[in-house]
């Protein structure tokens, strides 16, 4: 009986550890420094504080333990507030926060550069190990839509085949209830 209780407790503790997996977000400067030491792809979440869909990504897709585990193993994950007033140095260039003539906060120059001037929130920038942008993906992505996209880039499948061919044979690691959220 004691063995059963111990086994049950260990199982519950391991499940809660898996459920607590979170994405290790960092600044773009930190990701750049780490990429030099240990090359890895970079995933940049470009968001704003007022964006409802950005908050939903944080609470659903990014909170999914399967997504978080994969992101932590294959990417340096960056959060970039598109309206920060901070000066950010990236790839040897300084980008300053933009303040409009009326004194209100504008869009940060790095966010504008990364999104090619197409400001939409949330948007995600996938960069290779050389810190070159491969893809900009705009809009909210539920777990079911996000998972194959991160595998397509994280497993470097994009080098070998089209996304259409990849999606045809992709096998999800998400549980059916985790993948049930429909794209909005």
How would you name each of these model-derived features?
Residues 55-59:
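Detector for the c-type heme attachment site
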Residues 38-52, 77:
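Short active-site neighborhood of thiol/selenol oxidoreductases, capturing the structured segment around
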Residues 4-19:
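Sec-dependent N-terminal signal peptides
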Residues 28-33, 65-135, 143, 148-159:
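Thioredoxin-like thiol-disulfide oxidoreductase module
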Residues 18-34:
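N-terminal "domain-start" segment that seeds a small globular fold
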Residues 157-177:
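C-terminal partner/receptor-binding element of secreted or periplasmic proteins
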Residues 181-184:
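Short, solvent-exposed mixed-charge patches
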């Amino acid at each position: 009986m004691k063995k059963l209780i111990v086994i049950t407790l260990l199982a519950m503790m391991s499940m809660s550890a898996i459920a607590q997996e979170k994405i290790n977000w960092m600044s773009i400067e930190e990701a750049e420094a780490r990429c030099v030491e240990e090359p890895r792809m970079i995933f940049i979440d470009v968001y704003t504080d007022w964006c409802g869909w950005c908050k939903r990504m944080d609470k659903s897709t990014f909170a999914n333990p399967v997504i978080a585990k994969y992101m932590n193993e294959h990417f340096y994950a960056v959060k970039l507030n598109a309206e920060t007033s901070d000066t950010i140095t990236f790839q040897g260039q300084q980008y300053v926060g933009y303040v409009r003539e009326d004194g209100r906060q504008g869009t940060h120059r790095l966010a504008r550069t990364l999104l090619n001037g197409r400001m939409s929130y949330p948007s995600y920038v996938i960069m290779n190990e050389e810190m070159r942008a491969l893809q900009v993906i705009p809009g909210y992505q539920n777990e079911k839509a996000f998972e194959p996209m991160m595998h397509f880039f994280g497993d470097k499948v994009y080098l070998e085949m089209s996304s259409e061919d990849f999606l045809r044979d992709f096998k999800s690691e998400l549980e059916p209830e985790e993948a049930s959220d429909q794209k909005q």
